[in-house]
């Protein structure tokens, strides 16, 4: 996969691409990440990327020209692919695991990171394929949001995680929150690991994990259960918990 990031603050990404799993993914050629300062594509002596909005109003808007030209430039470097051009914006579609899995199937992603009051609307209408938000709050720019999406996508690429099952069993990947985890020692200051996890009976352990995953989702994110395909056993567990309230 190739990931291009367009930002007027490219140095912000050095910490993300130079550490941990993303660094290893780049070194192992599972993904290539290139950060471009789209200010370099702005016309004029001073390379200005923003301007006042027509009709007045507070703040400045990112101009269409530098972003259009920057996207065109990164496309020309990968002419054999048709990239998803992703605009990081609080008005976009809420990012989730399903979207991460969809993006992970692509060959080329281009992230546009904004600043100031917003974007010239022609960028939305004629350039991007996706508008993505990481939540109902405002950040200084789109860089942190792009980092979050990029991290979520890269870890799903084949060969990136040491254990291929890790991404499959994570919270949200199954539609439910993940079950509790424990490691050694079995007794830490009187706080004990559930006996069933020490039993060695894999069938019991899997059922316990399934039940605890459902219970955690029921208690913390019941909205996730609205369209979840529950088994008969899971329906029985939910009824027990509901009746005990």
From Swiss-Prot:
Q: Which UniProt keywords apply?
A: Cytoplasm, Methyltransferase, S-adenosyl-L-methionine, Transferase, tRNA processing
Q: Where in the cell is it found?
A: Cytoplasm
Q: Which domain of life is it from?
A: Bacteria
Instruction: Choose any GO biological process term that the UniProt entry carries and state it.
Output: tRNA N1-guanine methylation
Q: Which SUPFAM superfamilies match?
A: alpha/beta knot
User: What Enzyme Commission number(s) does the record list for this chain?
Assistant: 2.1.1.228
Q: Which residues cross the membrane?
A: none
Name the enzyme group at the top EC level: transferase
What's a Gene Ontology MF term here?
Answer: tRNA (guanine(37)-N1)-methyltransferase activity
The UniProt family comment states:
Belongs to the RNA methyltransferase TrmD family.
Q: NCBIfam families this protein is in? A: PRK00026.1 (NF000648), trmD (TIGR00088)
Q: What does this protein do?
A: Specifically methylates guanosine-37 in various tRNAs.
Q: Subunit structure, briefly?
A: Homodimer.
- Give the protein name, as stated in the record: tRNA (guanine-N(1)-)-methyltransferase
Recorded source organism is Listeria monocytogenes serovar 1/2a (strain ATCC BAA-679 / EGD-e)
> Taxonomic lineage of this organism?
Bacteria, Bacillati, Bacillota, Bacilli, Bacillales
């Amino acid at each position: 996969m190739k990931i291009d990031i367009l930002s007027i603050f490219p140095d912000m990404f050095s910490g993300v691409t130079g550490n941990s799993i993303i660094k290893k993914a780049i070194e192992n050629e599972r993904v290539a990440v290139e950060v471009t300062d789209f200010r370099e594509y702005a016309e004029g002596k001073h390379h200005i990327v923003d301007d006042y909005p027509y009709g007045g109003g507070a703040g400045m808007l990112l101009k269409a020209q530098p972003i259009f030209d920057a996207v065109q430039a990164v496309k020309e470097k990968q002419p054999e692919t048709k990239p998803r051009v992703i605009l990081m914006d609080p008005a976009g579609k809420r990012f989730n695991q399903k979207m991460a899995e969809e993006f992970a199937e692509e060959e080329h992603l281009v992230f546009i990171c904004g600043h100031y009051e917003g974007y010239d609307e022609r960028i939305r209408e004629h350039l991007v394929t996706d508008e993505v938000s990481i939540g109902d709050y405002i950040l200084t720019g789109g860089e942190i949001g792009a980092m979050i999406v990029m991290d979520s996508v890269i870890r799903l690429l084949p060969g990136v995680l040491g254990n291929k099952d890790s991404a499959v069993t994570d919270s949200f990947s199954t539609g439910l929150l993940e079950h509790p985890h424990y490691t050694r020692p079995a007794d830490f200051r009187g706080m004990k690991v559930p006996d069933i996890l020490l039993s060695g009976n894999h069938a019991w352990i899997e059922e316990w994990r399934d039940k605890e995953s459902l219970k955690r989702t029921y208690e913390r994110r019941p909205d996730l259960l609205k369209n979840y395909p529950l088994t008969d056993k899971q329906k029985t567990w939910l009824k027990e918990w509901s009746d005990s309230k």
